[in-house]
Amino acid sequence: MHLNRRQFLGGGLAGASLVLAACGNRSSTGPTSSVAPTPKPIRQPGSLPWPDLPAGSDQVPEIEHIVVVMMENHSFDNVLGLIGRGDGFTVGSDGRPTATNPDGHGNDVHAFHMPTDCQTTGVRNDWTAGHEAYDGGTNQGFVTSSTAEAMGYFTRDDLPFTCGMASVFPIADRYFCSAIAQTDPNRRYLISGTSLGLIDDSFPLDLPPNGVIYEQFDKHGITWRDYYSSAPTLGVYLPYLEEGNPLSKGVAKIDQFYADAAAGHLPAYCLVEPDYNRSSEEDPQDIQFGDQFLGGVVNAVMSSPNWPTTMLIWT
């Protein structure tokens, strides 16, 4: 893909402007008050983001299409810790990260550049290991809950496309998973705002009490698609994929995404999914396959007639 810096920045402007608009202007000369601000009411499930406006009101008219790509199981430092932006690694005088984790035997394991494109020992991401790694907020349990490979990281040489994009576009260095758990609980959160209390990849017996976001889209006439390579996220609630369920019509193979992007027919919202057996970056997959997949998706979006009014989010 050949895009210059001006094109990159132009594409990122819509997303960046949303952040700036939300922050507003800061003044050091304005009036002050000792009166504490009125606390905002606690948001409840099903509450509206703009309570004074009808449900489904468009508050971002500059953006007509939102494309979401959700990859697998890598931390900010693991992928972007050395790009020089955001809250990444602290680097010593030798240019290497200073981060360490104890191994449980009195030794410190230092962060190191992965010698291969695959984390072959499979850094654990289950509920128990995740909370052991979190270690009450100290993040000192990654090695003892998995192996020393948990301290491995990748660089621009390993992930040229990912790091190249992160060097230009806005990045979220304080974005955390909804549940310190495996894939399916977090994908349930993505489409329904809950994991139904499940902490593993088992299938729930019940549907989410407030439904999934796609049902709200249909209710308000907002177009959507779940474009999948090997399995759709909608399948974390199997009944939605059953023949006759209206949501099953919103699921399409990945080839349809590329066709829709090229034709300028992207829906208002779409989830674009990797092959979970090859290009999702799940351990022990070769991460370069994931980097290539992301390159293909971004290239398709940026080449689309829809691009001037599109926001792409990947995590």
Predicted regions and their residues:
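N-terminal pro-sequences and low-complexity stem/linker regions of secreted or lumenal proteins
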Residues: 2, 9-19, 24-315
